[in-house]
A protein has these predicted regions:
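Asp-box/BNR beta-propeller blade signature and adjacent active/binding-site loops
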Residues: 1-217
Length: 217
């Protein structure tokens, strides 16, 4: 991690955060930062969460997320978390175990991240998932869809992550499966901005694309 205290004019040196995951940490209602991820470049490669109580200056291991029976936790990747309206914390996990390979799994914590349920599939093929709690209280997940239609999709939950809607198509015009990792923010007017990377058919380089969209539900 690197930090800036002057609006991005200058940056600190890099320092470790214990776990790694592309979508980074979230801030909880109690002010803590929670980072769900994986201990990369270690022999154990634990999957779990660490926390910071000083705005990300230092990090401490909090809890391991248990593996589903028969799963190799080393095949869990690229986690992301969100705090739901009922106070639970949800984590989405990119699963590469043979059972439900390529699907997003979900684990929950009801005690602020100190302990976790066993990950379970939620019926969503696509990864990795980015979670966002909307101003309406609903949860939104956005994820790359690396088979036709190639692009990015979203799903909503209005019961704090217990069930998820049918997919909403954000983009479906990709040249192939080399795309995704969407991140989404809710703007002041309630609209959504989603950004992702995508490789083009006639170019050796990838590009960043964006979609400005609104929910109709």
């Amino acid at each position: 991690m690197i930090r800036s205290t002057d609006g991005g004019v200058s940056w600190s040196a890099r320092y470790p955060t214990i776990v790694n995951s592309p979508h980074g940490p979230i801030q909880l209602a109690d002010g803590r930062l929670l980072y769900a991820g994986k201990e990369l470049w270690t022999k154990a490669q634990r999957v779990g969460v660490c926390e910071s109580r000083d705005d990300g200056q230092t990090w401490h291991w909090l809890a391991e997320i248990p593996a589903r029976s028969g799963d190799d936790p080393k095949q869990y990747h690229e986690l992301h978390a969100a705090e739901s309206g009922d106070g639970r914390i949800l984590v989405h996990i990119r699963n590469h175990n043979k059972a439900n390979e390529g699907e997003t799994h979900q684990a929950e914590s009801a005690d602020g991240g100190k302990s976790w349920s066993t990950p379970h599939p939620i019926g969503v093929w696509g990864l990795p998932s980015f979670l966002l709690r909307l101003s309406s209280g609903k949860l939104l997940m956005t994820y790359g869809h690396r088979r036709p239609p190639f692009g990015n999709q979203a799903r909503l939950s209005d019961d704090h992550g217990r069930t998820w809607s049918e997919p909403l198509i954000i983009s479906g015009d990709g040249a192939g499966g080399d795309l995704g990792y969407p991140s989404t923010v809710e703007l002041a007017d309630g609209s959504l901005l989603t950004v992702w990377y995508e490789s083009l058919e006639a170019s050796p380089r990838a590009v960043l694309r964006q979609a400005h969209w609104r929910l109709s539900v």
